[in-house]
Amino acid sequence: MVEVGDIRKGMALIIDNDIYIVLDVNKHFTARGSGIIRTKMKNIRTGYVREFKFNSGEKVEEASLSLRHVQYLYRDGDLFYFMDLETYEQYALDKDIIGEAVYYLKENMELDLQFHDSTPIGVVLPNTVILEVVETAPSYKGDTVSGGGKPAVCETGLKVIVPFFVETGQKIKVDTRTGEYIERA
């Protein structure tokens, strides 16, 4: 059991016999009395996102998760296939379970899968990935005067704002936690 004040983004909790992944946590404290913790969580089984409100001091059950190092193999429609690097067992995860991580997956990429018991429930990406820019506007002299950047589309379909000097065909390093451009690779 974990106190609701200790809930953090990314934790797995068991509520009403379902496993939820915490997407967002907001803590509100009043001058008198106890605080209120509002959370946004995704149900692993159904994929629905739901909000929960807790009073400080309440306790919830934390789900025990394990990680397995896997390799992303390929995509077939809405299913993504991974192979355990130790046992060579293959797992198929639905696009709804993977969520926004689909924009960072490249074939043969190594990453971790989260498991509850023997069921895969999520993907743990590396902090950064290297992606190729497949579409971006050309740069013109004087673009840098206004600052900012220009939109680019990467090989996985990810849309990211890049500096003006980045061109189509170049590889860039992207932060998987924020979806932002870091540097040229």
UniProtKB/Swiss-Prot annotation:
It is found in: Cytoplasm. The keyword Cytoplasm applies. Pfam families: EFP (PF01132), EFP_N (PF08207), Elong-fact-P_C (PF09285). GO terms for cellular component: cytoplasm. It comes from the Bacteria. InterPro entries: Elong-fact-P_C (IPR015365), NA-bd_OB-fold (IPR012340), Rib_uL2_dom2 (IPR014722), Transl_elong_fac_P/YeiP (IPR020599), Transl_elong_KOW-like (IPR013185), Transl_elong_P/YeiP_cen (IPR001059), Transl_elong_P/YeiP_CS (IPR013852), Transl_elongation_fac_P (IPR011768). One of its GO terms (molecular function) is translation elongation factor activity. The keyword Protein biosynthesis applies. Keywords: Cytoplasm, Elongation factor, Protein biosynthesis. Gene3D superfamilies: 2.30.30.30, Nucleic acid-binding proteins (2.40.50.140). Pathway: Protein biosynthesis; polypeptide chain elongation. GO terms for biological process: peptide biosynthetic process. Belongs to the elongation factor P family. NCBIfam families: efp, PRK00529.1. Involved in peptide bond synthesis. Stimulates efficient translation and peptide-bond synthesis on native or reconstituted 70S ribosomes in vitro. Probably functions indirectly by altering the affinity of the ribosome for aminoacyl-tRNA, thus increasing their reactivity as acceptors for peptidyl transferase. This is Elongation factor P. It comes from Kosmotoga olearia (strain ATCC BAA-1733 / DSM 21960 / TBF 19.5.1).
